[in-house]
Amino acid sequence: MALGIKEIQEIIPHRYPFLLVDKVEELEPGKRAVGYKNVTMNEYFFQGHFPEEPVMPGVLQIEALAQLGAIALLSMDEFKGKIAYFGGINKAKFRRKVVPGDVLKLEIEIVKMKGPAGIGKAIATVDGEKAVECEIMFAVGK
């Protein structure tokens, strides 16, 4: 199942300038998702990070992965209309810079669920090269 920006906005509450998933190419609700963030020089964070050498902050790369995870979870029938909250990050490793012009491929697999809480294994790549990998903990609220 593929989703455009309008469908994404129907699932998660994030909006500009904090919506960091531009499209979802693959979606298996409650299991996994693959999506993309097109990184352009127009991103608000490049004004200060860093003016002479723009680099997408690593925490925002992880936030993009968390938003993709929220899409995967909130697409499940039992979680539709709810909000997914970030619970924590484990084993985060940053492997390369993400700069204007890059297309960040986002992938997450939900590996554990216990009630409304769980863990996702996530990776973001640029042209097949790892940018960041981590485990994301989450909880679905009301």
Swiss-Prot record:
GO terms for cellular component: cytoplasm; membrane. One of its GO terms (molecular function) is (3R)-hydroxyacyl-[acyl-carrier-protein] dehydratase activity. It comes from the Bacteria. Pfam families: FabA (PF07977). It is found in: Cytoplasm. Signal peptide: none annotated. Its EC number is 4.2.1.59. Keywords: Cytoplasm, Lipid A biosynthesis, Lipid biosynthesis, Lipid metabolism, Lyase. One of its GO terms (biological process) is lipid A biosynthetic process. It catalyses: a (3R)-hydroxyacyl-[ACP] = a (2E)-enoyl-[ACP] + H2O. The active site is at H49. The keyword Lyase applies. It is an enzyme of class 4 (lyase). Its main location: cytoplasm. The keyword Transmembrane does not apply. Involved in unsaturated fatty acids biosynthesis. Catalyzes the dehydration of short chain beta-hydroxyacyl-ACPs and long chain saturated and unsaturated beta-hydroxyacyl-ACPs. Belongs to the thioester dehydratase family. FabZ subfamily. HAMAP family: FabZ. PANTHER family: 3-HYDROXYACYL-[ACYL-CARRIER-PROTEIN] DEHYDRATASE. This is 3-hydroxyacyl-[acyl-carrier-protein] dehydratase FabZ. It comes from Clostridium novyi (strain NT). The gene is fabZ.
